[in-house]
Amino acid sequence: MKVLEGKRALVTLTRGMTELSRLVATTYGPNGSKVAVSKNGRVLVTTDGSALAHEVRFRDLHRLGASLVRGASTKVDRASGDGTSTTILLTGALLEAALDHYSPRTWNPVAIARDIQSYLPAVEGLLTDMSCSPDESLLERVAEMASHGDKVVSEHVVNAVIRVGENGTVLIRAGDGVGIEMDHREG
């Protein structure tokens, strides 16, 4: 059994988290790159940060750090239906910033957590100021970006979002055949 203590343990744990964050960052946004991951003889090529985060595995103690971030992103996904990549990227950035301020005498994870939480109202205010009511044109642009320019897919997504309304949920799954089907359920 390998035991690490102090800054060495913190750096090792954080490195797994930040490595996962950097990998997911390469897939992020409309210009995100494709990443290939080989696992058990099968290769996954994806621009989906969430799929990548759940498939990639690290060695040694870095694995533990990555699994902690992966778990946090899964909780966000369950609560909101999205946000896994953003959760991983923000967590990685916060951890790197916290590690820059590490000192064995002053290191206090609870104080760091409180400090981060103290910024939440300001961040929420900024996000509220930046938010806008989505019109059909904005939905089309977002859907087209998310579908990597596939107009057919983006049109179906926009139609589904408009159909379920602001508080509805759209679930997209890979089908058995070729083509796109839309199934609407009430309740």
Regions found by a protein language model. Give the residues of each.
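N-terminal glycine-/lysine-enriched basic segments
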Residues: 1-186
